[in-house]
């Protein structure tokens, strides 16, 4: 993957956008992981790794990432109609209320933040309106900052994996070293998934997400919860 065209300026932008310090509330979501730990499906570093590898290979994160790419392309061309289309498409593709609400909340938070620190992005934000999915907001920000699209996609998947590993470290629990080891082990698959997602055509967008959806639905009525999803 060629990301050598990233200048220092662009590299710093992608680091900021993918940072866990970005105030969008990602830390409060586990995407059903809390339920999977509660019911004994995920109990260790190895079972967490198996779950994340399956998600990267077949799961809903691939749809999100593919839509992020399309949002980036539409924002680059100021194609408001296409941008709105993919925002609605992704909202319809979310299978549970928690997953939909988390995407909307993070997207809204990112667009509000960008509107304050980069006011020139407001026309795009206003065109998409509310609710705005996080993948859409991330694509708009990456396009605005002229970040290499492959680097933006790599960062999107990496930040997703980082967030869920952090949740797993708290829930299972795991040590911090185990979490970093897992993130390192996922890097080849993240890179491979990036290449695959970049090549997907619109009519090839699909995923196998029934496990995620069932866990998310069960989480809505889980008695004790640390996370919002």
From Swiss-Prot:
Keyword Metal-binding: no
Gene3D superfamilies: Urease accessory protein UreF (1.10.4190.10)
Cellular localisation: Cytoplasm
One MF annotation (Gene Ontology) recorded for this entry: nickel cation binding
Keyword Ribosomal protein: no
Location, primary (coarse class): cytoplasm
Keyword vocabulary terms for this entry: Chaperone, Cytoplasm, Nickel insertion
Top-level taxonomic group: Bacteria
A Pfam family it matches: UreF
A GO cellular component annotation in the UniProt record: cytoplasm
Subunit structure, interactors included: UreD, UreF and UreG form a complex that acts as a GTP-hydrolysis-dependent molecular chaperone, activating the urease apoprotein by helping to assemble the nickel containing metallocenter of UreC. The UreE protein probably delivers the nickel.
Entry's family note: Belongs to the UreF family.
Function: Required for maturation of urease via the functional incorporation of the urease nickel metallocenter.
Protein name according to UniProt: Urease accessory protein UreF
Recorded name of the encoding gene: ureF
């Amino acid at each position: 993957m060629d990301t050598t065209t990233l200048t220092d300026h662009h590299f710093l932008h992608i680091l900021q956008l993918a940072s866990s310090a970005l105030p969008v509330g990602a830390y409060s979501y586990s995407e059903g992981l809390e339920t999977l730990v509660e019911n004994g499906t995920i109990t260790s570093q190895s079972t967490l790794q198996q779950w994340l590898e399956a998600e990267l290979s077949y799961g809903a994160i691939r749809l999100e990432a593919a839509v992020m790419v399309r949002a980036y392309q539409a924002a680059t061309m100021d194609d408001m109609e296409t941008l709105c289309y993919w925002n609605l498409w992704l909202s319809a593709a979310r299978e549970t209320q928690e997953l939909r609400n988390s995407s909307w909340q993070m997207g809204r938070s990112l667009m509000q933040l960008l509107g304050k620190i980069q006011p020139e992005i407001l026309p795009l934000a206003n065109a998409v309106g509310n609710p705005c999915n996080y993948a859409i907001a991330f694509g708009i920000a990456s396009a605005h900052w002229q970040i290499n699209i492959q680097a933006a996609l790599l960062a999107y998947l990496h930040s997703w994996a980082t967030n869920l590993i952090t949740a797993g470290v708290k829930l299972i629990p795991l040590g911090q070293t185990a979490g970093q080891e897992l993130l390192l082990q996922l890097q080849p698959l993240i890179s491979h998934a990036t290449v695959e997602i970049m090549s997907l055509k619109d009519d090839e967008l699909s995923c196998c997400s029934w496990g995620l959806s069932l866990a998310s639905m069960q989480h809505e009525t889980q008695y004790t919860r640390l996370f919002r999803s």
